UniProtKB/Swiss-Prot annotation:
Domain of life of the source: Bacteria
Free-text cofactor note: Binds 2 magnesium ions per subunit.
Sequence positions that bind Mg(2+) 2: 97, 100, 260
Cellular component terms (Gene Ontology): cytosol
Recorded catalytic activity of this chain's protein: beta-D-fructose 1,6-bisphosphate + H2O = beta-D-fructose 6-phosphate + phosphate
Family named by the database record: Belongs to the FBPase class 1 family.
This protein's encoding gene: fbp
Cofactor(s) needed: Mg(2+)
Name of the molecule in the record: Fructose-1,6-bisphosphatase class 1
One Gene Ontology MF term: fructose 1,6-bisphosphate 1-phosphatase activity
Positions bound to Mg(2+) 1: 78, 97, 99
Organism encoding this protein: Paracoccus denitrificans (strain Pd 1222)
């Protein structure tokens, strides 16, 4: 590891070794992705029972090895059932989704790495199973046409870009703020019939466009890569919804609180947005287990608050409103 893996002047000193390790592993993973090969080959299943691709395993091994010498006591990975002890003298605990969006490898859509940093406690459980607001750092690396990192240490969102000349992340912006005017929402509309009524009602209002109660025309986006969705919303605004639904295995949502939702929520709030499970702020919650799932809504603060308001309506009112909308029934 070298000091040149990331520009460190705006990184808190006690977090610099871990950030240098994350940047180094991210740059190395970006190079592996650029070289190509059969990276989407199925190789097994992870701790959650999701299919693993070859690149999932490569990414997990790479980040684990690189963080081992960076002052990290505990490492929790989405790809592993239990947290791993790295350095008994380490002061940090890192939770990581080494490769988000691996289903997009074959189609060459942007994929990423999501990470979260906590102060290390005596046990892995105490380090990770705590309120998400106790994070001291969080971010993601996006591997797309340009490789970039967004990270927060609780004082705004910093934007770094990977310089291909020396594989170092250079600071692009010190305080990224999310626009609040984008008329865009991201949701997998194929699951409409399974959603709870407040989510259907919100989407129906958006789809009604200028003739509906919102009196504005909205565009829908869906990439099926959380990092790519987050990056677009940080840059352009809008809102992302991945609600719980009626399907088996989706009753509590699908995204993981520790590895995905907590770090993204920290970033989004630091950029001026909001992040909830549909009702309650993600940062006010904690994961009861390492792989706990949760519904997830994030984006421009006004839009996230509006969705929460739909959930607060009495069920009879939502049902009455829903009965008059039902645009997908036509």
């Amino acid at each position: 590891m070298t000091a040149e893996t990331i520009q460190t002047d705006r990184i808190p000193p006690h977090l610099r070794p871990a950030m240098q390790a994350l940047a180094e592993a991210g740059a190395r993973l970006a190079a592996i992705i650029r070289r190509g090969g059969d990276l989407a080959q199925p190789v097994g299943t992870n701790a959650d029972g999701d299919g693993q691709k070859a690149l999932d395993v490569i990414a997990d091994d790479l980040f684990c090895q690189t963080l081992a010498g960076a002052g990290v006591r505990w490492l929790a990975s989405e790809e592993q059932e239990q947290a791993v002890a790295l350095d008994p003298e380490g002061t940090l605990a890192v939770a990581i989704d080494p490769l988000d969006g691996s289903s997009n490898i074959d189609t060459n859509v942007s994929i990423g790495t999501i990470f979260s940093i906590y102060p290390a406690e005596a046990t892995a459980e105490a380090s990770f199973l705590r309120p998400a607001r106790q994070q001291i750092g969080a971010g993601y690396i996006i591997y797309g046409p340009r490789c970039a990192m967004m990270v927060t240490f609780g004082d705004g969102v910093q934007h770094y870009a990977l310089d291909p000349e020396d594989d170092a992340f250079r600071l692009v912006a010190t305080r990224r703020q999310m626009p609040d005017c984008a008329l865009e929402f991201a949701i997998n509309a194929s699951n409409y019939r399974h959603w709870p009524q407040p989510i259907r009602a919100y989407i129906d209002d958006c789809l009604a466009g200028s003739d509906g109660p919102r009196e504005q025309n909205f565009n829908m986006r869906w990439i099926a890569s959380l990092v790519a969705e987050t990056h677009r919303i940080l840059v352009r605004g809008g809102v992302f919804l991945y609600p719980s639904d009626a399907r088996k295995g989706y009753e509590h949502g699908r995204l993981r609180m520790l590895y995905e939702c907590a770090p993204i929520a920290f970033l989004i709030e630091q950029a001026g947005g909001g992040a909830t499970d549909g009702r309650t702020a993600i940062l006010e919650q904690g994961a009861p287990t390492l792989h706990q799932r949760t519904p997830f809504v994030f984006g421009s603060a006004e839009k996230v608050a509006r969705i929460a308001a739909y959930h607060e309506l009495p069920e009879t009112e939502v049902s009455a409103l829903f009965g008059h909308r039902g645009l997908f029934r036509a």
